[in-house]
């Protein structure tokens, strides 16, 4: 006779085992109709799973995040159902949920085309619209293996053989004649799976191993209703317009080529943005009292063996050799910073020591994972490491957090999700040390009034960390900033300082990154601003144009005056119509266009236009220069008169 406690604290008693669906029906038919699954004592279960003992139960509907994830997972099964009907010889591999959707890896003889995807999506809709029930059956390991062996599903039998205990009872989900295996839960009926779209196909090795067979991965998105799906597809359309690869080409910022995969060729305008970012970061380094250093980009393999990188990270490291010595091109800056710290005797009076570098790093990312500026092999980190005592950790973390928010606000990022990752099972250091460290990180966040969520067990083996994830104008998440405590590396590399008691002690090391990779951050900014960089970042800030040859000398003189005032200005003296010039520079996203006709020359003024098409009228030259200087100096996100 289970007693069920609902989220509002109310209780309902039953004289027999019940399911989540039974409980929903007992509350009301509307809730039963909306019920997708349930959370029983904190665990997600199918709507039909029996509850025999007292339990806390929450009904999951499409309005819940978990409900949406279940819909997406069931759509992956629906994809399997449809593809087996269209191409019965298809072998099904895995079909998990991902951000905003799902995918399924399949093995079939034909190469799928866009026409095939459209046909597949049509069949999925036909099946879903019959609103069939999804039937769950728990079976023995052997029954599950026999079922998939009989169907020739060798990937499923491999999963059973290698990943599932013989004592387990796998869940088989029956979609009419199609059967799939999953821990669940799934929707009870396909009426919940009407709002989806297949998006693209790519290649994927079985289990991510290039030694295995290449499968075809079919991606899709799924939502709770038509409105959500339409809004998401609109966001995708907007994201395509903002694609930094497309804008980078339009604005001539950079290029990449096959001879240097994952390496950036910065063109003049793109490099101007890069250097302006460096200037900005340097002003903050000075403000927050960091030293700027520069380490070598290549060091002996022996050093990387000491740090543990060679054992755990060598697949991602580029190596070379000379004179019978093997060298590693650095994937990160921290070991080099410890070497700098180790030069000369350090006292507790020298701490905290804050060391920053624009470090040129390289990582051997898989070629299939490379993506414009967002995923590269060669990149520059705005990296810093703080050497301090245990007692100084809290204040230093506090300062790091202030610096993170100070810098992000300059770029207009307002939604920042913060997560605190705590001790994993395998770790170094005492529980007491972890207790204090985690408490210091949490206290620093609370002191700054920053809401955060814990990620239990997600910290590195050498210390807890804070992650800062930016959300852009399309609400896409970009994990950029980290503040990571490290109890391991300084000791591994023999870093020490003389403490107050005159004994050598190992410093705590704080890894701190804010922008992360400079290249990736420029990619993020390009998409955030759609190429309309704020004036302080814009490669060309002002173009001065003449209407006829009669104003050429005035334009040239004004351009020099702007340049001498520290403004990135260019003159356009081409023999083209003024409308053509304005249109061209507007497409180049130049913040300001200054037009000079005879009236402007006579009055010592310029006609000012913005790239958004706003006419600011005729303004005195010195006033324009002063206003532009102020906008650039303050790193204002908005243009004049906006």
Swiss-Prot record:
Entry GO terms, CC: cytosol
Example of a GO MF term:
tRNA binding
Where, by residue number, does Zn(2+) bind?
Answer: 334, 385, 511
Task: Tell me the InterPro entries matching this sequence.
Answer: aa-tRNA-synt_IIb, aa-tRNA-synth_II, aa-tRNA-synth_II/BPL/LPL, Anticodon-bd, Anticodon-bd_dom_sf, Beta-grasp_dom_sf, TGS, TGS-like
Q: Does the keyword Magnesium apply?
A: no
Q: How is the cofactor bound?
A: Binds 1 zinc ion per subunit.
Query: What is the protein's name according to its record?
Result: Threonine--tRNA ligase
Q: Which organism is it from?
A: Erwinia tasmaniensis (strain DSM 17950 / CFBP 7177 / CIP 109463 / NCPPB 4357 / Et1/99)
